Amino acid sequence: MTDFSQIHKPVLLQECVDLVTPALHASDSVAVDCTLGLAGHTIAFLKAAPNATVIGIDRDEEALDKATARIAQEGLSARFVPVHAAFDQFDEVLRAQGVSRVQAVFMDLGLSSLQIDERERGFSYAHDAPLDMRMDTSQALTAREILATYDADRLAHIFKEYGEERFSKPIAKRIVQQRQSSPLETSSQLTALVDAVIPAARRGSGNPAKRVFQALRIEVNGELDKLRRTLPQIGLHLAVGGRLVVESYHSLEDRTVKNFMAQGLRVDAPADMPVIPPDMQPFFKALTKGAVKADAGEIAYNPRSASVRLRAVELTRPLPQRWVHAFELESQGSEDGVRGAHGHRRRTQARRG
């Protein structure tokens, strides 16, 4: 029997349980774990909410198999439904299960321990490995293919947009030059190339290649696009009183989650309206004050929690399709100056849960 506790430490586990399980008291409650991984959070949810069923989604078949086996070891299989899918197939997954509304949705947007620790997956710059970075190994696109085929402008764009890399253009130029003589095949080759480009005086903390690796991983797996598509789907399927709980690990993810939640926390009425009618009240109630971060004890126990940002909201009234459409349009444009469906700027709702 595998001791998964030695290889998998769920981040902010108790905080997530405390946020998710109050919505799971009814006997027919359904929660969705959009990022099952090795099921650390899901097992805790199942134990804390004995009347609930959890649908566990993961695009990594190996992780899904291991998680399913782990849940069986815990004797919890009767209330668990494993699904091999990407989380942007949320609507499709629920339709296939005959579910229209769910009481809780959880997302842990970080890499799973399995993905980080298996060197051949190529996610970590700490170990030499093939430049793969696929979460779903059945897909075709790999980091190696991106580095071998994207032109300099496209490479620079993803390094800047997804990695917030200041030296995106010179790094992209060097990659194109390098591949004319020999392709970049391994993580150590890429790390050495980036190390040679970034001046020592301009480096921040950590490995100089960390932003490039982040950008490649996001591009390979379409992470931000999938997240932007998924959040509105989740909103439409949450029951009133249902909760959305999200852990993110870099600023781009957190910004996307924060903006989605912030739109639902705003009052859809002019700032000078003295009494706010029910149909202009916020759609969400905040369950966290800003983002919850790991404390020193958590970080000492689980160093991978150092960058986590945990946000949670509760749905207070159903989201209309027009609101979801407005978010989709907004996410394609500026993230500032969010406006309501009536064309006026919406004011921030101060009440916190």
Swiss-Prot record:
Q: What is its EC number?
A: 2.1.1.199
Q: Where does S-adenosyl-L-methionine bind?
A: 39-41, 58, 90, 108, 115
Query: Which SUPFAM superfamilies does this UniProt record tie to the protein?
Result: Putative methyltransferase TM0872, insert domain, S-adenosyl-L-methionine-dependent methyltransferases
Q: Where is the composition biased (Basic residues)?
A: 341-353
Tell me the enzyme class.
transferase
List localization entries: Cytoplasm
Q: Catalysed reaction per UniProt?
A: cytidine(1402) in 16S rRNA + S-adenosyl-L-methionine = N(4)-methylcytidine(1402) in 16S rRNA + S-adenosyl-L-homocysteine + H(+)
Give one Pfam family. Methyltransf_5
Q: Does the keyword rRNA processing apply?
A: yes
The UniProt entry, under Gene3D superfamilies, shows:
Putative methyltransferase TM0872, insert domain (1.10.150.170), Vaccinia Virus protein VP39 (3.40.50.150)
The segment annotated Disordered runs over 334-353
This entry's Gene Ontology molecular function terms read:
rRNA (cytosine-N4-)-methyltransferase activity
Alphabetized UniProt keyword annotations? Cytoplasm, Methyltransferase, rRNA processing, S-adenosyl-L-methionine, Transferase
According to its UniProt entry, one GO biological process term is: rRNA base methylation
Asked if the keyword Isomerase belongs to this entry, the reply reads no
The protein's matches in InterPro entries, at most eight in alphabetical order, are given as: RsmH, SAM-dep_MeTrfase_MraW_recog, SAM-dependent_MTases_sf
Q: What is its main location?
A: cytoplasm
Q: Which NCBIfam families match?
A: 16S rRNA (cytosine(1402)-N(4))-methyltransferase RsmH
Q: Which family does it belong to?
A: Belongs to the methyltransferase superfamily. RsmH family.
Query: What function does the entry list?
Result: Specifically methylates the N4 position of cytidine in position 1402 (C1402) of 16S rRNA.
Protein's name in the database = Ribosomal RNA small subunit methyltransferase H
Q: What is the lineage of its organism?
A: Bacteria, Bacillati, Actinomycetota, Actinomycetes, Bifidobacteriales
